[in-house]
Amino acid sequence: RSTYETLIDKVREYGCIPVMLSLPPIDSMKFYSYICSGFCAEKKNNVLQWLGGSVNTIGNWHEMYNLELYRIAAQEGVRLIDITTCFLSRRDFSSLFCDDGMHPNEEGHQLISDAICAAMPAVV
């Protein structure tokens, strides 16, 4: 939180308008499979137990982080561009990610770029 607040302050100090992005969603199963690739069954099970028995815990943590971005933006009076919805509105949003289930691929980055370009007239 403090890192975001510091960055926002720095951007304003330079006379610029800070803008934040929400996070793209995460494909929890793809991410779990990616980080556990090469693990034996016992190690995979250990990771799953650490997650409380559900791979969905990964997505829940990710969404909590995303919600904190919305809170920071609101408290700091910063415009936040919602890219989360751009992904979730696609039935096949998982196809917009690399094999790790977290980082957008080229098509996912294009979706982010389009969302930013569409929002910019309201920012400047």
Regions found by a protein language model. Name each.
Residues R1-V124:
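Alpha-helical cap/lid subdomain in secreted, periplasmic
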